[in-house]
């Protein structure tokens, strides 16, 4: 970018029911306790399953997401076309399959300022129920790191944080199959430009993905969320000016509901990122990003700059937005 009781035999159930009936009749015969009072007492004693049901945004673990980031950082620099990025791909695929997702590799070759490079997007859909409707919402991140000749760039925040978050979202959402089948996960390769962002340099994966969608007909997707650089210890999510207004309102409302609104604001300048090619083909996609990050594209973009709390904040708000707004209908 740039500026997740055993069944009781019927007979035993009947016996318990008969004994309960006897006890109630006995109470009514030998006590002055009104039936209404007894019914109220029994009703109050029955626990409510709804009251104790865990909300999906409460299931997200910033600590688990951070472990994914750590694994990617441990691989070292993994720019597009490198041996290390193949290891990153294998790790992402393994984690997604463990959470119940089927992964497809979308491989292609493109011209770059460094010559032809092979890129691979990873596209995941939830397993099972092949007759279900096609996914209608995109969740995206890039997983490559920028290529530098002079520094060792591991991209803990830029590439790592959003990938770790998306893997944790996959775990949490995968526990709710009906919701998971509405979502397509996309891990873009080649987000980073080799020289300067332009129509032909940078956003290689998202540009190719959008082009294929447009050729096939992109009408099935009614929206998407892109995550990028969301792990900064001093978190300040800044939505770009080109954010689809309705989606921005939903993100702000989700943050407000979780009492996290102070972490979300608007960016005061335009931003080029992987959401742009999707918006260009009329898939309203919002970029959740903290672009004011002092270590962007430096050797100091390392794991110590990332916090589980920041990942927790972003993941919780995203899940609230998905469950209460984006996928509500």
Label the predicted regions.
Residues 72, 106-108, 126-128, 140-144, ...:
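Active-site-proximal beta-strand/loop segments in catalytic clefts of secreted hydrolases
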Residues 150-254, 258-259, 267-270, 275:
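Acidic/histidine-rich catalytic neighborhood of metal-dependent amide-processing enzymes
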Residues 1-39, 43-45:
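Intrinsic disorder/low-complexity segments
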Residues 64-71, 87, 91-98, 103, ...:
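Extracytoplasmic/secreted proteins, especially bacterial periplasmic and envelope-associated proteins
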Residues 84, 105, 109-111, 223, ...:
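Active-site-adjacent substrate-binding region
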Residues 65-78, 148-150, 187, 234, ...:
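Acidic/histidine-rich, surface-exposed loop or edge segments in extracytoplasmic proteins
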């Amino acid at each position: 970018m740039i500026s997740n009781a055993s069944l009781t035999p019927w007979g035993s159930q009947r016996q318990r029911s008969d004994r309960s009936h006897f006890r109630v009749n006995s109470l009514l015969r030998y006590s002055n306790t009104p039936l209404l009072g007894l019914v109220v007492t029994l009703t109050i004693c029955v626990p409510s399953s709804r009251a104790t049901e865990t909300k999906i945004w409460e299931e997200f673990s910033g600590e688990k997401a951070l472990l994914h980031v750590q694994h990617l950082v441990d691989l070292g620099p993994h720019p597009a076309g490198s041996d290390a990025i193949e290891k990153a791909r294998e790790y992402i695929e393994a984690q997604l399959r463990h959470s119940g997702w089927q992964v497809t590799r979308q491989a292609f070759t493109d011209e770059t300022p460094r010559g032809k490079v092979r890129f691979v997007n990873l596209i995941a859909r939830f397993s099972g129920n092949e007759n279900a409707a096609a996914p209608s919402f995109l969740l995206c991140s890039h997983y490559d790191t920028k290529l530098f000749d002079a520094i060792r760039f591991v991209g803990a925040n830029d590439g790592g944080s959003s990938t770790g978050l998306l893997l944790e979202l996959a775990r949490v959402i995968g526990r709710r199959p009906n919701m998971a089948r509405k979502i397509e996960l996309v891990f873009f390769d080649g987000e980073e430009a080799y020289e300067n962002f332009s129509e032909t340099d940078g956003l290689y994966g998202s540009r190719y993905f959008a082009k294929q969608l447009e050729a096939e007909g992109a009408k099935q997707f009614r929206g998407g969320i892109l995550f990028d650089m969301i792990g900064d210890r001093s978190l300040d999510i800044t939505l770009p000016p080109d954010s689809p207004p309705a989606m921005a309102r939903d993100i702000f409302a989700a943050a407000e509901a979780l009492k996290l609104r102070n972490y979300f604001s608007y960016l005061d300048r335009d931003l080029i990122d992987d959401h742009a090619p999707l918006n260009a083909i009329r898939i309203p996609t919002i970029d959740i990003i903290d672009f004011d990050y002092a270590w962007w594209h430096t050797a100091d973009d390392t794991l110590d700059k990332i916090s589980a709390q920041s990942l927790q904040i972003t993941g919780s708000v995203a899940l609230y937005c998905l469950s209460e707004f984006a996928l509500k209908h």
